[in-house]
A protein has these predicted regions:
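Short, acidic/hydrophobic/Gly-rich beta-strand patch recurrent on exposed beta strands
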Residues: 28-33, 152-155, 219-221, 350
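Extended interfacial segments that mediate partner engagement and assembly in macromolecular machines
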Residues: 65-77, 83-192, 212, 227
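Residue-level signal for inorganic ion chemistry
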Residues: 30, 45, 88, 205, ...
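Short beta-strand micro-motifs enriched in acidic
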Residues: 42, 51-55, 140-144, 208-212
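Short, solvent-exposed loop/turn elements at beta->coil junctions and helix N-caps
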Residues: 122-130, 195, 203-204, 440-443
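Short, aliphatic-rich beta-strand segments
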Residues: 207, 213-223, 281-285, 385
Length: 462
């Protein structure tokens, strides 16, 4: 007869662990008897020594203090800020290993939560270049203990600024702009905003780059209307940032964590920069919603379009449409496109994007997806295809019931959280919509996030 071995671990204990799995947040999982110990910045196959930081009934959190035997997937860390700033989760392992972790996570969650053990899944769509893909940076500005200006990224789960000169996830132009701004700020006479008091002028440096055109926007978020010596900043940015097309001041006087205020003033250049996505043109302002990884977004949209199976005769309903990018990328293959989005500014962007691209068969409605869909269903709308791209919390069950009553032939579900996806797919099956195929997409390499595209078909067409 086998007896379970019970380990009584407590805070500050030192334990040896073999990492055998990963959590959704990217922490390695090792076991002490029945206790699962979660340790960040480890890889499957690592043997480590860990210090226990916190203990619950069935699990604990630890910190690696020594690497006894490295995993074959472990690589040398190439960023001095890794583990300090909250930007990356997986810089310590090969990109192939990261993709395998993400694909397995989708597979496991669909099985465990949804009960989909044999659902066909295509290999995860990885990035050709897993670094330098982010086309937007929001860099908080602060003061260190020596009263010197710092600028960079927040430490994981905190508002403590890690001073960074560059970021491996961002393009070279951002490093150039950061360097120029830092040197200018030191002698400009502009003071730094302090969250505690709401006093001070410089809040954030906000950068955007258009991947297709190389155009760069530099925006300074200020607690006020402007900055001293703006002309000098423009001159220096123009000299050192080759793709620069726009310098903007954004005014945010609110004592808030929201980065951008509503008022923008163009100091030099154009109000927007221009990019292309899936053959469409987009004009991007500081306030525009836009995909952070343009290249991977194009791959994801191509999969969604393939699953939609449009022939030119369909009514397409795009729920949680944001600025309309997914729906607009399919509009030429549809008879009619209706987009629904709850954020008014995003709806305005969507309408503008359709006008810029001469798309005349699209309309956009501002409203909650579940409520708007119910109204449209009662009005008699019967779309052939519905695309849904909900936030992390997934769909309301009431929306899924409304979709079922609309009786589309196909539903394309774009998910940013495998757990809520699995739950929602289960609800869809109860309404007669069966998932046919799943494709994970790595939209944000080196982070723990994974996107998933699913095709569902109507088993009981009316």
């Amino acid at each position: 007869m086998k007896h379970k071995i019970h380990f009584h671990i407590k805070k500050n204990d030192i334990v040896q662990l073999e990492i055998t799995g990963m959590t959704a947040e990217g922490r390695g999982v090792g076991r002490c008897g029945e206790i699962a110990v979660f340790v960040p910045y480890t890889a499957i196959g690592d043997t480590i020594e860990a210090k226990i930081l916190k203990v619950a009934k069935t699990y604990a959190f630890g910190k690696m203090i020594s690497l006894i035997k490295p995993s074959q997937d472990r690589i040398e860390i190439d960023c001095k800020y890794f583990t300090k700033c909250g930007g990356c989760t997986y810089r310590h392992m090969t990109y192939q290993a990261e993709l395998e972790v993400k694909e397995q996570r989708v597979r496991d969650v669909l099985n465990r939560i949804g009960g989909f053990s044999d659902l066909p899944m295509k290999p995860i769509v990885g990035a050709k270049h897993p670094d330098h893909y982010r086309n937007k940076a929001q860099l908080p500005i602060g003061i260190d203990d020596n009263q010197s200006m710092i600028m960079g990224f927040y430490s994981n789960r905190s508002h403590r600024i890690i001073d960074c000169e560059s970021c491996a996830l961002q393009p070279k132009s951002f490093t150039q702009a950061m360097d120029v701004f830092r040197k200018w700020a030191d002698t400009s006479g502009n003071d730094v905003y302090k969250e505690e008091t709401g006093k001070g002028r410089m809040r954030h440096l906000y950068l955007r780059e258009a991947g297709a055109t190389g155009e760069v926007m530099a925006c300074v978020v200020v607690n006020g209307n402007g900055l001293y010596h703006e002309d000098t900043l423009v001159k220096q940015l123009r000299e050192h940032v080759p793709g620069l097309k726009s310098v903007i001041i954004n005014s945010n006087r609110e004592k808030t964590n929201v980065i951008l205020g509503k008022k923008c003033r163009t100091v030099w250049g154009s109000d927007t920069i221009k990019d292309t996505l899936c053959g469409l043109t987009f004009h991007i302002s500081p306030l525009s919603f836009y995909q952070v990884n343009r290249t991977q977004a194009e791959k994801l949209y191509a999969i969604a379009k393939e699953y939609a199976g449009l022939t030119g005769e369909e009514i397409l309903l795009d729920l949680y449409c944001g600025t309309g990018t997914i729906g607009l990328s399919m509009a030429h293959q549809a008879k009619r496109l209706i987009g629904v989005e709850v954020i008014e500014a995003a709806v305005e962007n969507a309408r503008k994007n359709s006008q810029i691209n001469g798309i005349e068969n699209a309309e956009f409605i501002c409203g909650d997806a579940a409520s708007a869909a119910e109204v449209l269903e009662k009005q008699g709308l019967r779309p052939n295809v519905i695309v849904i791209d909900p936030p992390r919390k997934g769909c309301d069950q009431s929306l899924i019931k409304t979709i079922s009553r609309m009786s589309p032939d196909r539903v394309v579900y774009v998910s940013c959280d495998p757990a809520t996806l699995a739950r929602d797919l289960k609800w869809f099956t109860e309404e007669g919509y069966m998932p046919q195929e799943v494709t994970p997409v790595d939209m944000f390499p080196r982070t723990a996030h994974v996107e998933t595209v699913v095709l569902l078909t109507n088993e009981f067409p009316k």
